[in-house]
Protein backbone atom coordinates (compact mmCIF):
# COMPACT_ATOMS: atom_id res chain seq x y z
CA UNK A 1 0.00 0.00 0.00
CA UNK A 2 1.36 3.42 -0.94
CA UNK A 3 2.01 5.75 1.98
CA UNK A 4 -0.73 8.30 2.50
CA UNK A 5 0.33 11.92 2.62
CA UNK A 6 -0.18 13.59 6.00
CA UNK A 7 -3.19 15.84 5.55
CA UNK A 8 -3.51 18.89 7.77
CA UNK A 9 -7.16 19.12 6.87
CA UNK A 10 -8.32 17.39 10.07
CA UNK A 11 -8.60 19.29 13.33
CA UNK A 12 -5.96 18.34 15.91
CA UNK A 13 -6.73 17.32 19.51
CA UNK A 14 -4.37 16.37 22.35
CA UNK A 15 -5.55 13.60 24.65
CA UNK A 16 -4.09 11.16 27.15
CA UNK A 17 -4.88 8.17 29.32
CA UNK A 18 -5.24 8.66 33.09
CA UNK A 19 -6.22 6.31 35.92
CA UNK A 20 -4.96 3.93 38.62
CA UNK A 21 -1.81 1.85 38.17
CA UNK A 22 -2.44 -1.52 36.44
CA UNK A 23 -5.97 -0.66 35.35
CA UNK A 24 -4.81 -0.93 31.74
CA UNK A 25 -3.94 2.57 30.48
CA UNK A 26 -1.00 1.41 28.37
CA UNK A 27 -2.81 -1.71 27.09
CA UNK A 28 -5.69 0.53 26.00
CA UNK A 29 -3.27 2.89 24.22
CA UNK A 30 -1.86 -0.12 22.34
CA UNK A 31 -5.38 -1.36 21.54
CA UNK A 32 -6.44 2.01 20.08
CA UNK A 33 -3.42 2.15 17.74
CA UNK A 34 -3.96 -1.50 16.73
CA UNK A 35 -7.63 -1.08 15.80
CA UNK A 36 -7.10 2.26 14.03
CA UNK A 37 -4.08 0.84 12.16
CA UNK A 38 -6.45 -1.59 10.41
CA UNK A 39 -8.40 1.41 9.14
CA UNK A 40 -5.19 3.16 8.04
CA UNK A 41 -5.43 5.77 10.81
CA UNK A 42 -2.37 4.81 12.86
CA UNK A 43 0.66 2.61 13.01
CA UNK A 44 0.11 -0.15 15.56
CA UNK A 45 2.27 0.44 18.63
CA UNK A 46 2.95 -2.52 20.91
CA UNK A 47 2.53 -2.41 24.69
CA UNK A 48 6.30 -2.74 25.30
CA UNK A 49 7.08 0.17 22.98
CA UNK A 50 4.70 2.43 24.89
CA UNK A 51 5.70 1.16 28.33
CA UNK A 52 9.41 1.91 27.97
CA UNK A 53 8.63 5.60 27.83
CA UNK A 54 11.63 7.84 27.16
CA UNK A 55 12.63 10.34 29.82
CA UNK A 56 11.90 13.93 28.96
CA UNK A 57 13.00 17.09 30.67
CA UNK A 58 10.37 19.76 31.18
CA UNK A 59 11.58 22.76 33.23
CA UNK A 60 14.32 20.56 34.67
CA UNK A 61 11.89 17.88 35.84
CA UNK A 62 12.37 14.35 34.55
CA UNK A 63 9.11 12.94 33.23
CA UNK A 64 8.60 9.64 31.44
CA UNK A 65 5.97 9.99 28.75
CA UNK A 66 5.06 8.07 25.62
CA UNK A 67 3.53 9.85 22.68
CA UNK A 68 1.55 8.08 19.98
CA UNK A 69 -0.52 9.59 17.21
CA UNK A 70 -3.52 8.30 15.35
CA UNK A 71 -6.51 9.54 13.44
CA UNK A 72 -10.20 8.83 13.15
CA UNK A 73 -12.34 9.77 10.17
CA UNK A 74 -12.82 13.24 11.69
CA UNK A 75 -9.68 14.13 13.61
CA UNK A 76 -5.98 13.78 14.20
CA UNK A 77 -4.96 12.91 17.78
CA UNK A 78 -1.75 13.17 19.75
CA UNK A 79 -2.02 10.81 22.72
CA UNK A 80 0.19 10.80 25.81
CA UNK A 81 0.60 7.87 28.20
CA UNK A 82 2.78 7.87 31.33
CA UNK A 83 4.09 4.68 32.94
CA UNK A 84 4.23 5.79 36.57
CA UNK A 85 1.89 7.69 38.88
CA UNK A 86 4.56 10.30 39.71
CA UNK A 87 4.96 10.96 35.97
CA UNK A 88 1.26 11.80 35.70
CA UNK A 89 1.42 14.20 38.61
CA UNK A 90 4.43 16.01 37.13
CA UNK A 91 3.06 15.92 33.61
CA UNK A 92 -0.27 17.44 34.54
CA UNK A 93 1.16 20.14 36.80
CA UNK A 94 3.96 21.24 34.43
CA UNK A 95 1.71 20.97 31.38
CA UNK A 96 4.52 19.08 29.64
CA UNK A 97 1.94 17.39 27.45
CA UNK A 98 -1.16 19.55 27.27
CA UNK A 99 -4.40 17.59 27.28
CA UNK A 100 -7.60 18.90 25.71
CA UNK A 101 -9.38 15.86 27.11
CA UNK A 102 -8.57 12.61 28.89
CA UNK A 103 -9.53 8.95 28.75
CA UNK A 104 -10.04 7.77 32.33
CA UNK A 105 -9.32 4.04 32.49
CA UNK A 106 -10.99 2.17 35.35
CA UNK A 107 -10.81 -1.59 35.87
CA UNK A 108 -14.35 -2.99 35.93
CA UNK A 109 -13.02 -5.76 38.19
CA UNK A 110 -11.65 -3.38 40.85
CA UNK A 111 -13.64 -0.17 40.53
CA UNK A 112 -12.23 3.29 41.33
CA UNK A 113 -8.99 3.23 43.37
CA UNK A 114 -6.94 5.99 45.13
CA UNK A 115 -5.10 7.12 41.97
CA UNK A 116 -8.38 7.15 40.02
CA UNK A 117 -9.54 9.82 42.45
CA UNK A 118 -6.21 11.64 42.43
CA UNK A 119 -6.04 11.82 38.63
CA UNK A 120 -9.62 13.15 38.42
CA UNK A 121 -8.75 15.79 41.03
CA UNK A 122 -5.57 16.75 39.15
CA UNK A 123 -7.45 16.94 35.85
CA UNK A 124 -9.98 19.31 37.42
CA UNK A 125 -7.21 21.46 38.93
CA UNK A 126 -5.11 21.84 35.81
CA UNK A 127 -7.99 22.61 33.48
CA UNK A 128 -8.63 19.31 31.64
CA UNK A 129 -12.35 19.87 31.13
CA UNK A 130 -13.44 16.75 29.29
CA UNK A 131 -13.15 13.14 30.42
CA UNK A 132 -14.36 10.02 28.62
CA UNK A 133 -14.36 6.79 30.68
CA UNK A 134 -13.21 3.35 29.53
CA UNK A 135 -14.26 0.55 31.91
CA UNK A 136 -11.54 -1.98 31.17
CA UNK A 137 -11.15 -5.70 32.02
CA UNK A 138 -14.88 -6.29 31.55
CA UNK A 139 -14.03 -9.86 30.48
CA UNK A 140 -13.07 -10.57 34.12
CA UNK A 141 -16.54 -9.67 35.42
CA UNK A 142 -19.35 -12.20 34.97
CA UNK A 143 -22.13 -10.23 36.60
CA UNK A 144 -23.42 -7.27 34.52
CA UNK A 145 -24.80 -5.71 37.71
CA UNK A 146 -21.27 -5.36 39.06
CA UNK A 147 -20.29 -3.39 35.97
CA UNK A 148 -23.30 -1.11 36.49
CA UNK A 149 -22.21 -0.59 40.08
CA UNK A 150 -18.69 0.46 39.05
CA UNK A 151 -20.21 2.76 36.43
CA UNK A 152 -22.31 4.46 39.13
CA UNK A 153 -19.27 4.84 41.39
CA UNK A 154 -17.26 6.45 38.60
CA UNK A 155 -20.08 8.88 37.76
CA UNK A 156 -20.36 9.88 41.44
CA UNK A 157 -16.61 10.42 41.65
CA UNK A 158 -16.65 12.64 38.54
CA UNK A 159 -19.55 14.67 39.98
CA UNK A 160 -17.63 15.11 43.23
CA UNK A 161 -14.79 16.87 41.40
CA UNK A 162 -16.96 19.13 39.26
CA UNK A 163 -17.21 17.02 36.09
CA UNK A 164 -20.66 16.27 34.60
CA UNK A 165 -20.59 12.62 35.74
CA UNK A 166 -24.15 11.89 34.63
CA UNK A 167 -23.44 12.98 31.05
CA UNK A 168 -19.93 11.53 30.74
CA UNK A 169 -19.66 8.82 28.07
CA UNK A 170 -18.66 5.45 29.58
CA UNK A 171 -17.52 2.66 27.25
CA UNK A 172 -17.20 -0.90 28.54
CA UNK A 173 -14.68 -3.36 27.10
CA UNK A 174 -11.40 -5.20 27.43
CA UNK A 175 -8.24 -3.76 25.89
CA UNK A 176 -6.39 -7.07 26.28
CA UNK A 177 -9.17 -8.96 24.46
CA UNK A 178 -8.90 -6.44 21.64
CA UNK A 179 -5.16 -7.10 21.28
CA UNK A 180 -5.70 -10.87 21.38
CA UNK A 181 -8.61 -10.86 18.89
CA UNK A 182 -7.67 -8.18 16.39
CA UNK A 183 -9.75 -9.68 13.57
CA UNK A 184 -12.87 -10.24 15.64
CA UNK A 185 -15.11 -7.22 15.01
CA UNK A 186 -17.27 -8.11 18.02
CA UNK A 187 -14.26 -7.96 20.38
CA UNK A 188 -12.78 -4.76 18.91
CA UNK A 189 -16.13 -2.94 18.83
CA UNK A 190 -15.42 -1.28 22.22
CA UNK A 191 -12.51 0.67 20.67
CA UNK A 192 -14.74 1.94 17.85
CA UNK A 193 -17.28 3.03 20.47
CA UNK A 194 -14.57 4.72 22.53
CA UNK A 195 -13.22 6.67 19.54
CA UNK A 196 -16.75 7.73 18.56
CA UNK A 197 -17.31 8.99 22.12
CA UNK A 198 -14.01 10.91 22.07
CA UNK A 199 -14.74 12.37 18.61
CA UNK A 200 -18.14 13.65 19.67
CA UNK A 201 -17.69 14.48 23.37
CA UNK A 202 -14.29 16.19 23.49
CA UNK A 203 -14.62 19.46 21.55
CA UNK A 204 -11.95 20.71 19.17
CA UNK A 205 -9.91 23.25 21.19
CA UNK A 206 -9.94 26.89 20.22
CA UNK A 207 -6.78 27.57 18.25
CA UNK A 208 -4.25 29.91 19.85
CA UNK A 209 -4.77 32.41 17.02
CA UNK A 210 -8.50 32.71 17.87
CA UNK A 211 -7.82 33.71 21.49
CA UNK A 212 -7.27 37.32 22.65
CA UNK A 213 -3.79 38.70 21.87
CA UNK A 214 -1.06 38.34 24.51
CA UNK A 215 2.71 38.72 24.31
CA UNK A 216 5.11 38.47 27.28
CA UNK A 217 7.73 41.24 27.09
CA UNK A 218 11.23 39.76 26.91
CA UNK A 219 13.28 42.81 26.04
CA UNK A 220 12.85 46.54 25.49
CA UNK A 221 14.88 48.99 23.46
CA UNK A 222 14.59 52.43 21.92
CA UNK A 223 14.83 53.23 18.22
CA UNK A 224 15.91 56.85 17.92
CA UNK A 225 13.24 58.94 16.29
CA UNK A 226 10.70 56.11 16.31
CA UNK A 227 10.08 55.21 19.93
CA UNK A 228 10.11 52.20 22.22
CA UNK A 229 10.08 48.62 20.96
CA UNK A 230 9.04 45.60 23.05
CA UNK A 231 10.20 42.19 21.83
CA UNK A 232 8.84 38.75 22.64
CA UNK A 233 7.04 35.71 21.33
CA UNK A 234 3.31 36.06 20.77
CA UNK A 235 1.68 33.56 23.16
CA UNK A 236 -1.82 33.74 21.71
CA UNK A 237 -4.01 35.73 19.38
CA UNK A 238 -3.19 38.13 16.56
CA UNK A 239 -1.77 41.68 16.65
CA UNK A 240 -2.32 44.17 13.82
CA UNK A 241 -0.53 47.46 13.28
CA UNK A 242 -2.79 50.14 14.75
CA UNK A 243 -4.26 47.88 17.45
CA UNK A 244 -4.70 49.28 20.94
CA UNK A 245 -2.92 47.17 23.59
CA UNK A 246 -2.55 47.22 27.36
CA UNK A 247 0.70 46.90 29.25
CA UNK A 248 0.08 44.77 32.33
CA UNK A 249 2.02 43.53 35.35
CA UNK A 250 4.91 44.53 37.65
CA UNK A 251 2.85 47.49 38.88
CA UNK A 252 -0.75 47.98 39.92
CA UNK A 253 -1.81 50.37 37.17
CA UNK A 254 -2.37 49.23 33.61
CA UNK A 255 -1.22 51.54 30.80
CA UNK A 256 -2.75 51.72 27.34
CA UNK A 257 -0.87 52.29 24.11
CA UNK A 258 -1.13 51.66 20.38
CA UNK A 259 1.10 49.33 18.39
CA UNK A 260 2.34 51.49 15.51
CA UNK A 261 4.58 48.92 13.84
CA UNK A 262 5.51 45.21 13.91
CA UNK A 263 8.81 43.73 12.84
CA UNK A 264 9.93 40.12 12.53
CA UNK A 265 13.43 39.15 11.35
CA UNK A 266 13.94 42.81 10.34
CA UNK A 267 10.95 42.71 8.03
CA UNK A 268 7.83 44.80 8.56
CA UNK A 269 4.60 42.88 9.14
CA UNK A 270 0.96 43.99 9.05
CA UNK A 271 0.01 41.36 11.58
CA UNK A 272 1.72 38.98 13.98
CA UNK A 273 0.16 35.75 15.19
CA UNK A 274 0.63 33.18 17.98
CA UNK A 275 4.13 31.69 17.77
CA UNK A 276 5.80 34.67 16.05
CA UNK A 277 8.88 36.30 17.60
CA UNK A 278 8.35 40.01 17.04
CA UNK A 279 9.27 43.54 17.97
CA UNK A 280 6.27 45.81 18.56
CA UNK A 281 6.71 49.58 18.30
CA UNK A 282 4.62 51.29 20.99
CA UNK A 283 3.29 54.84 20.75
CA UNK A 284 3.98 57.25 23.61
CA UNK A 285 5.65 54.74 25.94
CA UNK A 286 9.00 55.74 27.45
CA UNK A 287 11.81 53.22 27.78
CA UNK A 288 11.54 53.29 31.59
CA UNK A 289 7.77 52.69 31.62
CA UNK A 290 8.03 49.13 30.34
CA UNK A 291 10.04 46.14 31.53
CA UNK A 292 10.61 42.44 31.07
CA UNK A 293 7.95 40.47 32.93
CA UNK A 294 5.06 42.63 31.78
CA UNK A 295 2.73 41.51 29.01
CA UNK A 296 1.17 43.30 26.07
CA UNK A 297 -2.44 42.19 25.72
CA UNK A 298 -5.76 42.96 24.12
CA UNK A 299 -7.50 45.55 26.37
CA UNK A 300 -9.62 43.95 29.08
CA UNK A 301 -8.47 40.39 28.39
CA UNK A 302 -6.13 39.88 31.35
CA UNK A 303 -5.59 41.58 34.72
CA UNK A 304 -2.70 41.94 37.20
CA UNK A 305 -2.88 40.02 40.49
CA UNK A 306 -0.75 39.43 43.58
CA UNK A 307 -2.63 36.66 45.37
CA UNK A 308 -3.47 33.24 44.02
CA UNK A 309 -3.74 29.57 44.95
CA UNK A 310 -1.58 27.14 43.02
CA UNK A 311 -1.20 23.38 42.72
CA UNK A 312 2.54 22.75 43.02
CA UNK A 313 4.90 19.84 42.50
CA UNK A 314 8.08 20.15 44.58
CA UNK A 315 11.17 18.72 42.90
CA UNK A 316 13.08 15.90 44.53
CA UNK A 317 16.74 16.22 45.40
CA UNK A 318 17.58 13.91 42.43
CA UNK A 319 15.76 16.30 40.12
CA UNK A 320 17.92 19.21 41.24
CA UNK A 321 15.41 20.37 43.84
CA UNK A 322 15.79 21.15 47.53
CA UNK A 323 17.36 18.64 49.89
CA UNK A 324 15.24 19.80 52.83
CA UNK A 325 11.56 20.57 53.44
CA UNK A 326 10.15 24.10 53.51
CA UNK A 327 7.63 25.61 55.91
CA UNK A 328 4.90 28.25 56.09
CA UNK A 329 6.16 31.71 55.13
CA UNK A 330 8.79 30.31 52.73
CA UNK A 331 9.76 33.13 50.30
CA UNK A 332 11.08 31.86 46.98
CA UNK A 333 10.82 33.45 43.52
CA UNK A 334 7.86 32.63 41.30
CA UNK A 335 8.80 32.59 37.63
CA UNK A 336 5.88 33.61 35.39
CA UNK A 337 6.50 33.63 31.61
CA UNK A 338 9.66 35.77 31.49
CA UNK A 339 10.46 36.93 35.00
CA UNK A 340 10.95 36.06 38.67
CA UNK A 341 8.78 37.71 41.34
CA UNK A 342 9.30 37.10 45.05
CA UNK A 343 6.30 35.74 46.94
CA UNK A 344 5.48 34.22 50.30
CA UNK A 345 3.53 31.00 50.70
CA UNK A 346 0.77 29.89 53.02
CA UNK A 347 0.34 26.15 53.46
CA UNK A 348 -3.09 24.51 53.90
CA UNK A 349 -4.34 24.04 57.44
CA UNK A 350 -2.79 21.04 59.15
CA UNK A 351 0.21 20.95 56.81
CA UNK A 352 3.37 21.71 58.78
CA UNK A 353 5.93 21.37 56.01
CA UNK A 354 6.41 20.32 52.41
CA UNK A 355 8.95 17.66 51.46
CA UNK A 356 10.80 17.37 48.14
CA UNK A 357 8.66 15.10 45.89
CA UNK A 358 5.31 16.28 47.37
CA UNK A 359 2.51 17.91 45.44
CA UNK A 360 0.35 20.39 47.29
CA UNK A 361 -2.06 23.32 47.11
CA UNK A 362 -0.58 26.56 48.39
CA UNK A 363 -1.74 30.16 48.72
CA UNK A 364 0.81 32.67 47.42
CA UNK A 365 1.16 36.43 47.83
CA UNK A 366 3.57 38.11 45.38
CA UNK A 367 5.33 41.40 46.14
CA UNK A 368 4.41 42.84 42.71
CA UNK A 369 1.38 42.01 40.57
CA UNK A 370 1.68 39.74 37.55
CA UNK A 371 -0.69 39.38 34.58
CA UNK A 372 -2.29 36.04 35.33
CA UNK A 373 -5.24 33.79 34.57
CA UNK A 374 -6.33 30.39 35.81
CA UNK A 375 -4.30 27.45 34.42
CA UNK A 376 -1.22 29.66 33.96
CA UNK A 377 1.98 27.68 34.63
CA UNK A 378 4.85 28.92 36.77
CA UNK A 379 8.10 27.67 38.24
CA UNK A 380 9.31 28.16 41.81
CA UNK A 381 12.97 29.11 41.94
CA UNK A 382 15.63 29.70 44.54
CA UNK A 383 18.70 31.57 43.43
CA UNK A 384 18.00 30.75 39.79
CA UNK A 385 17.47 27.01 40.22
CA UNK A 386 14.03 25.48 39.84
CA UNK A 387 12.73 23.84 43.02
CA UNK A 388 9.08 23.45 42.04
CA UNK A 389 6.56 23.71 39.26
CA UNK A 390 2.97 24.83 39.51
CA UNK A 391 -0.25 25.93 37.93
CA UNK A 392 -2.60 28.73 39.05
CA UNK A 393 -5.87 27.12 40.16
CA UNK A 394 -7.70 30.17 41.57
CA UNK A 395 -6.98 33.89 41.69
CA UNK A 396 -7.69 35.41 45.10
CA UNK A 397 -7.30 39.13 44.39
Curated annotation (Swiss-Prot):
Record region (G2): 60-64
UniProt entry keywords in alphabetical sequence: Cytoplasm, Elongation factor, GTP-binding, Hydrolase, Magnesium, Metal-binding, Nucleotide-binding, Protein biosynthesis
Protein residues bound to Mg(2+): 26
Subunit structure: Monomer.
Full protein name: Elongation factor Tu
Gene: tuf1
GO molecular function terms listed in the Swiss-Prot or TrEMBL record: GTP binding; GTPase activity; translation elongation factor activity
Subcellular location(s) of the protein: Cytoplasm
GO biological process, one term: sulfur compound metabolic process
Amino acid sequence: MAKAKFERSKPHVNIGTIGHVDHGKTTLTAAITTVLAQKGGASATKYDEIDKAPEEKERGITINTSHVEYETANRHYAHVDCPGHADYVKNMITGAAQMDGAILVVSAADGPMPQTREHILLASRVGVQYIVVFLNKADQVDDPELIELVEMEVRELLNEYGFPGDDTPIVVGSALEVLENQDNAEKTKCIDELMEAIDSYIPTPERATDQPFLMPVEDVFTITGRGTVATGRVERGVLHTGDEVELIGMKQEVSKTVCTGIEMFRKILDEAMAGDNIGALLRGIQRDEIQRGQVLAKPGSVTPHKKFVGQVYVLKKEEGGRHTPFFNGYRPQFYFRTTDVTGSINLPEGVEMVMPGDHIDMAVELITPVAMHENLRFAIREGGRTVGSGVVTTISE
